[in-house]
């Protein structure tokens, strides 16, 4: 099975789990950010939750601009994982713990994602560490899930350190090991003087990298 098909299967199971258990779509705090994923009406002036579901793009987006900017060839799975859908973060449970998969909520979020991938790759180069790119977080967000760009394997990584625990030989194998997690939506907490410019999982990753940069 390809990474693309494995992601399709996980998302299908994710939606089915919500319908079977709650008879509704998942809920999410969009924080004023519109998305084709939203089911029903959307009011940008409120901070209420919305019902949503992942929406497959008409054309798969890619990271060719990132490759050009950094003169690097990214593992092909990055295009399949991030370029197929618009979606909120996808909570999961697995033998190694609970976490969330990162996805782009809308096109602006996808472009922010590309910039964050660039920042991550630059930081890895600065630290003289092998290139990786993140796909999500574990637990409370102090550990990242990252893909080794050389061979496509999936690992646990702490910001500023090398990948430390291998979880799967490929992103396909990793996705096949996950089970959807049904959980109430978590509203990101704004901590002054910072502002929350990315909902949910984005704020976690941003906080991790802010912490790393303060240490360096």
Swiss-Prot record:
Name this polypeptide is given: Protein Syd
Record family assignment: Belongs to the Syd family.
InterPro entries: Knr4/Smi1-like_sf, Syd, Syd_sf
Function description: Interacts with the SecY protein in vivo. May bind preferentially to an uncomplexed state of SecY, thus functioning either as a chelating agent for excess SecY in the cell or as a regulatory factor that negatively controls the translocase function.
Keywords: Cell inner membrane, Cell membrane, Membrane
One Pfam family hit: Syd
Keyword Cell membrane attributed: yes
Domain of life: Bacteria
Subcellular location per the Swiss-Prot or TrEMBL entry: Cell inner membrane
Topology in the lipid bilayer: Peripheral membrane protein
UniProt keyword Cell membrane, yes or no: yes
Cited HAMAP family: Syd
Recorded GO CC terms: cytoplasmic side of plasma membrane
Organism of this sequence: Shewanella frigidimarina (strain NCIMB 400)
UniProt-listed CDD domains: Syd (cd16323)
Lineage: Bacteria, Pseudomonadati, Pseudomonadota, Gammaproteobacteria, Alteromonadales
């Amino acid at each position: 099975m390809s990474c693309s098909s494995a992601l399709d299967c996980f998302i299908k199971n994710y939606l089915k789990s919500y319908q079977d258990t709650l008879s509704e779509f998942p809920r999410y705090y969009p924080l004023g950010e519109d998305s084709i994923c939203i089911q029903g009406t959307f009011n940008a002036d409120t901070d209420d939750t919305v019902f949503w579901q992942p929406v497959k793009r008409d054309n798969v987006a890619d990271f060719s601009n990132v490759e050009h900017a950094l003169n690097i060839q990214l593992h092909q799975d990055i295009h399949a994982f991030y370029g197929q859908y618009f979606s909120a973060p996808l909570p999961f449970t697995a033998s190694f713990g609970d976490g969330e998969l990162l996805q782009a909520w809308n096109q602006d979020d996808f472009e922010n994602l590309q910039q964050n991938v660039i920042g991550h790759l630059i930081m890895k180069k600065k630290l003289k560490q092998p290139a990786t790119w993140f796909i999500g977080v574990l637990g409370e967000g102090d550990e990242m899930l990252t893909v080794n760009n050389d061979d496509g394997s999936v690992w646990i990584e702490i910001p500023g350190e090398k990948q430390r625990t291998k979880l799967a030989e490929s992103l396909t194998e990793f996705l096949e090991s996950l089970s959807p997690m049904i959980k109430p939506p978590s509203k990101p907490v704004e901590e002054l003087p910072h502002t929350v410019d990315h909902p949910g999982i984005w704020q976690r990753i941003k906080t991790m990298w802010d912490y790393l940069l303060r240490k360096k």
